[in-house]
Amino acid sequence: MLENIPSQSTMIELLGQSLFEVWQALCSAIDEKYDMERLWNTGGKNWTYEYKYRRGGKTLCCLYAKSNCIGFMIIFGKDERAKFEDIRDTLSDVVCRQYDEAKTYHDGKWVMFEPTNADEFDDYVKLLAIKRKPNRK
């Protein structure tokens, strides 16, 4: 867990104003549907920060930030991959391509999106619903 949570100005400096707005919009889209614990961490060797959504010890998704770049990761387990295939026809080509190109590990398929705008957010919400039903009315 991160001791010093980055301020809004730190995030704007890191991402740039337009990507910071995308970051905020993505967080809002998730917060609107899910009441989750949110944890800041260091971003490992590839990212500056990790912002994880989890509940009951299970991770829903993670957002990552580094200089002028946002990452949005969802890990799909075996059953969740089958559910993805069930809704594939409702998703954009961009989202399907990212999914298809993602590496599958022993614990799941790690799909990293790098949004630059809100165009795919509706699809992201559908993907999150595969992981967990929204728990906000």
Name the predicted role of every residue range.
Residues 1-137:
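Charge-dense, helix-prone N-terminal extensions
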